[in-house]
């Protein structure tokens, strides 16, 4: 928001920016820092917003969301990483397997279980953790898309209870909301890349000659180019719908995402 030093952009403006990033194959962790972790922080308390959002705006801080665990797959509530309140601090123990943007991040937002059973929707909390905190170890690795991710191990990592985002044990709904916003941004990035690839393919078919004529005159390739164009346009339409539905009620938003 403008109160936090931003431009008061919404999902549509984020879509436009992400689509342009896709066209340029920008691999910097913008979505992880600004859309995902920024999405959590702007819903935090005033002290958290004042403490952390300026660092994102200035570019001094890079953030990553540590949520994925080997057994969790697509269940965001399936968490074996725990945080136990001990006086003024939470003690975190556990493991996160795929932390996108982790190699560049100096701060993490970590989903942890503070109560309940491993797959319960209640009992999920969000904590801010600095990368240099004692007991936190990171192993970086490349991903198939040319980016990088991290594995993170927490061994009795202590963080202040002031680092809790929102209410303890009630983080599940906020995680679903921000993940939906992230999905919409990633889809926007994807259609930007698809646009460039489709245009490059059409141009190649116009200029590459075989048997004395451009290969774009061959009917089989024309059919393939039409199929590519239709798939691209369908992807654009779906992405627009997802972004327009982000401000709807939970059921409509989840259905679109």
Residue ranges of model-derived segments:
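A structural signal for short hydrophobic beta-strand segments in well-ordered beta-sheet cores
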Residues: 81-84
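Charged, glycine-rich active-site and insertion segments that engage polyanionic ligands
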Residues: 251-257
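Glycine-rich beta->alpha junctions and the first turn(s) of the following alpha-helix
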Residues: 8, 22-23, 136-233
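A short, Trp-centered hydrophobic/proline-enriched beta-strand micro-motif
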Residues: 59-68
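A short core secondary-structure module
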Residues: 93-137
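Structural signature of FAD isoalloxazine-binding scaffolds in flavoprotein oxidoreductases
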Residues: 8-20, 75-79, 129, 153, ...
